[in-house]
Amino acid sequence: MEQHPIKINKVQIRNLQIEDYAQLSQSFTRVYSDGSDVFWTHKQIQKLINIFPEGQIVTVVDDKIVGCALSIIVDYDKVKNDHTYAQVTGKETFNTHNPEGNILYGIEVFI
């Protein structure tokens, strides 16, 4: 199969802003194309931006969001090695985020 180069004019890595949500949700839909509605809500993204803006990153190619990395900081003493995703994210409420914690926990990454 012959591959054709794709022209890219601009690649940007920056902090996620709530104004990005429409594009971000479109990316979620493409990434999770199995028909499930397992993606972050506007309210959840807003909370992540409010509590830890520097931990929410997007990759933008030619003004289009093509990836993201979402994270929180947690205290390892409260999480330990045998945690579940629900436990470490506070069942996706992010009430486990602790700015004084000692672990950066990635809760979503895709490109």
Where are these predicted regions, by residue range?
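Short amphipathic alpha-helix that is part of the acyltransferase structural core
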Residues: 1-79
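Conserved acyl-donor/pantetheine-binding loop and adjacent beta-alpha core of acyl/acetyltransferases
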Residues: 69-110
